[in-house]
Amino acid sequence: MLKFLRGHAHQVYTALAVLRMNDERLVMDLCVTDVPMRNYSDGELETYVLTGDPLDKAGAYAIQHPGFHPVENMKGCYASVMGLPLCHLIRVLRTLDVALGTDVPAACQSLLQYQCPVSRAILRGEQIG
């Protein structure tokens, strides 16, 4: 899988569904993120595979892996590639009138050390990753 992805872009699709129990209202959203993989060497790939990390990952990689760094020039939702697109979740929760006391996009970017170029657009309702 990682040899196939090497040097190419692919898309990660992450779907969300939140059910409000008191009125059974279901709100769904979909995040599609373009992921440009870098041209890592066979040696880097072998070292990463030997860690065992790719064995339980969709796509066989963790974008946040501290040693491998499989992705370059990311321009989409980093959190989505990790598994939970937080801005999309906020958008769903707002639709359900759930108020949050935390600036989730700022907290996400601070935690991930990633300046997200799409968070504002997502929160405006645009369909981008």
Annotated model-derived regions:
Residues 1-129:
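Anionic-ligand binding patches
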